[in-house]
């Protein structure tokens, strides 16, 4: 989308992308390298739709998605839009074929330019009221004793969407600019790892 808008001279400084906070940071890298504003929002297409609504008439939305592989390519439908996404991927596949490439080739090209990404989800199930209490305690424990290292990589940034704070390893603290609080914790490591925890 961005590449073709650039080639056609249609990429504007007012264009923006949206991703949810738990979505791959490859999107952030794409936005950064192409000087496109990126907005992070909470999970759910209502939050992506909110970003479109607050920018209506001022900025142009050019795409957004979340980790569940949902994508919203246009601003007309304000929810996960599979039919439009299918049309868009068909258009991209046709363009790739004209270039003698496949969708897989394009994906590898994106990874080579912006960085590889691997995502996975771990579900911890604790049934009943006792389970709900255990999960609540897990979140409290993570807040009280945040990890300093994950998988052998040092944690350099910690985001708490309940207190709306970003803490850095150097001790500095910034406010998170979000429209509401959410019970989500994130850690960012030196090797590029991002871990998100939410009940």
Positions of predicted regions on the chain:
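Phosphate-binding and adjacent anionic-ligand microenvironments
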Residues: 8-197
